[in-house]
Amino acid sequence: MTSANIQMAVYCFDVINAQLNREKEPPVPKEIPNVKLPLFVTWKKGHQHDLRGCIGTFSDLRLGEGLNEYAKTSAFHDSRFKPISREEVPSLQCGVSLLINFEPIHNFRDWTIGRHGVRMNFDDGHRNRSAVFLPEVAQEQGWNHVETIDHLIRKSGYGGHINDALRSALRIVRFQSSKLVLDYKDYVNYKQSHGLPLPR
């Protein structure tokens, strides 16, 4: 099984630094395996680790290409936030999540908080709605199963009444992830210790 490693998060920092500094794209490090996996890239900011962007894909993408694409998409094109600025980069933390072990479930409580992420979709009579939480979200927020599912329904944009009938009608897939988190200072330390050029 491929696990998230520090070079993946270093590469994500390199990618957004190159974009912000209008430099050429960095090469994919040899330590990033040439395999295809679903992935998410998450940016958080400051001591409180406030979310600044989180976007990914459930499609199998070659890791180097996927990390490049979603490092930029989550940093600059998450519609919930303004694009990350050059001035913010030193306060950032990057999280790389490689998604594995997808399993459809038939009971909305059939997943483990802190271990499983959940992806759900349903038809509200007007449109199909979908949303996802990565495995760490429910635990970080202190939510139980019902609260997590209800927040997921709201995240999908649904504003109607939520009850057990709706929860039980959801199509839910649980999954796990291999995650690596890297603060900017550790990114700089990594670059220095490996004799790599520092960002401007």
Curated annotation (Swiss-Prot):
InterPro entries: AMMECR1, AMMECR1_dom_sf, AMMECR1_domain, AMMECR1_N
Domain AMMECR1: 1-191
Gene3D superfamilies in UniProt: Hypothetical protein ph0010, domain 1 (3.30.700.20)
Pfam families: AMMECR1
This protein's name: Uncharacterized protein R166.3
Originating organism: Caenorhabditis elegans
